[in-house]
Amino acid sequence: MLPLPLSILLLLTQSQSFLGEEMDVYSEKTLTDPCTLVVCAPPADSLRGHDGRDGKEGPQGEKGDPGPPGMPGPAGREGPSGRQGSMGPPGTPGPKGEPGPEGGVGAPGMPGSPGPAGLKGERGTPGPGGAIGPQGPSGAMGPPGLKGDRGDPGEKGARGETSVLEVDTLRQRMRNLEGEVQRLQNIVTQYRKAVLFPDGQAVGEKIFKTAGAVKSYSDAEQLCREAKGQLASPRSSAENEAVTQLVRAKNKHAYLSMNDISKEGKFTYPTGGSLDYSNWAPGEPNNRAKDEGPENCLEIYSDGNWNDIECREERLVICEF
């Protein structure tokens, strides 16, 4: 509410049109309210008065309601970096990632400790023959031979001096002949060793030899026949072991001469005779080939066991002489 002096001033300064040309005049008797304002109409053609002085500043009003938020101001300059905070607790493990690319070859590792001793290996191939040693002394005289047929009478000779001289001469000749025979035997023995080395084995009077060729059964049989021999036909464990050593040396399974081409299930020698020795692997012969063909021929493994196979298969050729 405006103070009283200011209200009077405003009323006095209002235009005549605003206040109206007529105003009611009240007597003092009717002004019973001390706050009643009495306004007098200005005389006609009167001059406008000066503006009154500003009134005193009124008391401070109550705080109004908050206005709406203003528009955001421009972004300020970036402040200095703060100090690094202390390390937070570890987070929970993330999901398993995809496998990375394959790494390169690493540096060689440290040598490991020696392993345990391995199993005993198979018997190696025979070593080369040694140099021929010096001739040994003559052996003891053998038993006398059978008596020969009586010869034709010779011409009568001159009278000898003594019979003792003739006997000594004959004894010396016999000793010389025995030494020559021993020398020839040593030469034959060394020659036999040279022939067998490195691809041959001898058992008794048999010799088993291979040239390393690999052929079908019929071609292998033909090759041995042309060499005046036949495919290996072991008839004892010693002969079977000799053939096995050649198989190990070449690291290839080999053909044996026996087959059951004439009668299924009955293996015989090339001469037609029945086997007097065999060394079949467990479950053999089974006559079951991979392509369902007949297994009429025989091979020997590196362990000495036998197995029946198809005759068209190619195996190592070992001939017997």
UniProtKB/Swiss-Prot annotation:
PANTHER family: PULMONARY SURFACTANT-ASSOCIATED PROTEIN A, PULMONARY SURFACTANT-ASSOCIATED PROTEIN D. Residues 49-162 form the Collagen-like domain. Residues 43-163 are annotated as: Disordered. GO terms for biological process: positive regulation of phagocytosis; surfactant homeostasis. Belongs to the SFTPD family. This is Collectin-43. Keywords: Calcium, Collagen, Disulfide bond, Hydroxylation, Lectin, Mannose-binding, Repeat, Secreted, Signal. Residues 1-20 form the signal peptide. PROSITE patterns: C_TYPE_LECTIN_1, C_TYPE_LECTIN_2. Hydroxylated.
